[in-house]
From Swiss-Prot:
Belongs to the ATP phosphoribosyltransferase family. Short subfamily. GO terms for molecular function: ATP binding; ATP phosphoribosyltransferase activity. Heteromultimer composed of HisG and HisZ subunits. It comes from Campylobacter concisus (strain 13826). Catalyzes the condensation of ATP and 5-phosphoribose 1-diphosphate to form N'-(5'-phosphoribosyl)-ATP (PR-ATP). Has a crucial role in the pathway because the rate of histidine biosynthesis seems to be controlled primarily by regulation of HisG enzymatic activity. This is ATP phosphoribosyltransferase. Its main location: cytoplasm.
Length: 204
């Protein structure tokens, strides 16, 4: 049996749809259940940020997680495949009437992705003070907590609704299939067979 960690939300639904097309089974989580067993698979419904931990620690053989999460945490996993779902961007956001002043000695940036943020601004030789937040990132510049934010953006509508604009793109992201390193040795044939089936399905 292969254990698969999925992030709650649309990416989980899109991933299960790929499995439905490949295997012809229902692959539906019952209401509020966090574990689904179907055929040779056991699916775990997990918070997006926790997927690398489940896979790294071996609680799941494989997982589906955003590239932004992989780049932020750099987990010791095997990156197998870009699933071409959950596409988004990591962007800099600022207030509509402002521009980002890179000449300042230090910019205050609110984000839940401190590593991506720090690395990006380091390449620009811009000093930053990271304000680590876990939600409602858009609020920070509106109340003077930060000069700008770094956040995941799909359509940009949340920023617009809160009087912010995109001031720059840091990276593109989409959902990746990853594997635990030990599982990739012990269950290599099963995982590679699944990898090939998924690759064939998403390239149709």
């Amino acid at each position: 049996m292969i254990t698969v960690a999925l992030p709650k939300g649309r990416i989980a639904e899109d991933t299960l749809e790929i499995f439905r097309k490949i295997f012809g089974s229902s692959f539906m989580f019952e209401d509020r259940k966090l574990i689904l067993e179907e055929g040779n698979f056991r699916f775990l419904m997990v918070r997006n940020q926790d997927i690398p931990t489940y896979v790294t620690e071996g609680a799941a053989d494989i997982g589906v997680v955003g590239l932004d999460v992989l780049e932020e945490h750099k987990p010791n996993v095997v990156r197998l495949l870009d699933l071409q779902i959950g596409k988004c961007k990591v962007c800099i956001g600022i207030k509509n009437e402002e521009e980002l002043d890179f000449s300042r000695s230090e910019l205050k940036i609110a984000t839940k992705m401190p590593n991506i943020t720090r690395n990006y601004f380091a390449k620009l030789a811009v000093g930053v003070k990271i304000i680590k937040l876990y939600g409602s990132i858009e609020l920070a510049p509106l109340v003077g907590l930060s000069d700008a934010i770094v956040d995941v953006v799909e359509t940009g509508s949340t920023m617009k609704q809160n009087g912010l604009k995109v001031a720059g793109d840091i990276m593109q992201s989409s959902a990746y299939l990853i594997a635990n390193k030990n599982s990739f040795i012990i269950k290599k044939d099963e995982i590679l067979e699944l990898y090939q089936k998924i690759k064939d399905e998403i390239s149709k």
